Amino acid sequence: MFHEGKALPVSSSVERELHADQERLYQDVLRLLTANRVPFAVSGAFALQEHTKVGRPAKDLDIFLTSEAAALALDILSKDGFRCEVCDPVWLAKVYRDDFFVDFITGMSNAAITVTNSWIARARPTVVLGVPTRILAPEELLASKMFVVRRERFDGADIAHIIFATRGQLDWSRILDLAGAHWEMLLSSLVLFRYIYPAQSHYVPLPVWTQLVDRLMLKILSPDPSARFRGSLVDENMFAIDVKEWGLDDLLSEYRACRGSNIRWPSHTIEDREGAA
């Protein structure tokens, strides 16, 4: 169904221009983090362009890093005059200057997937906006999009483009490891890829198809009556009725509560901010 309102971006290989102040913010943040040896990797629109040549308007700069590195980065940037905010300690902080911002992302909002040091170690050297930096590897970029399947935003096309653009030359063992217990989300993305690009289904290696489909068939043939409802991990709003009215499991709250490492604002920074208030 077509909804009137703000036009959605149309895919293209054309690189989108940034506002001059926006570009300077991104460059300054990248340089400061690099100069202070904060381990991170660029993701989002810049990583997608790097790996697929698909251009997209960059409303922000996505930086992936561990929770510990995020706290260090916030400390460094706040001391340099940037306005910093921990929006959700489970996964998101923001760095602002004027009307523009940078996102620090430490995992998925549902806490099903968390950025670890291995994500950063596997990042690839590149140049973003003239600044030498590192960009998320395609395997981690793909994994970061598996749960972006909400009604208002869906990254299935990005996953399909990653597989298509790389011709499937990916570390599939790594992708399977990243998916872990959520392998069915990966399988659903691969089935969509096969539907979109039927002539390129071989880009996903046959052993990967076999492993995932066999696991699915085993689950179907031997269903677990105690298996828990997982809808809230997919879209907490669309499946709110299941949790709030029908009494089904709220795995989202459980996952978020069990998140081992949240973004913690440095204590001395909190004191500085309170003293300035």
Pin down the residues of each PLM region.
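Helical scaffold of the NTase/Pol beta-like nucleotidyltransferase catalytic core
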Residues: M1-V42
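Catalytic cores of NTP-dependent nucleotidyl/adenyl transfer enzymes across multiple folds
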Residues: F2-P9, T114-A277
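Short, flexible loop segments at the rims of nucleotide/cofactor-binding pockets, characterized by
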Residues: E17-H19, D62, I113
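Active-site nucleotide-donor binding segment shared across nucleotidyl transfer reactions
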Residues: Q27-L61, L65-L74, I135-A137, D242-A277
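Anion (oxyanion) recognition and catalysis
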Residues: T34, S78, V127
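Short Asp/Glu-rich motifs
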Residues: T52-K53, Y96, H182
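Short, hinge-like loop/turn segments at secondary-structure boundaries
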Residues: A58-D60, F82, D103-F104, A121, ...
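Conserved catalytic core of two-metal-ion nucleotidyltransferases
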Residues: K79-S118
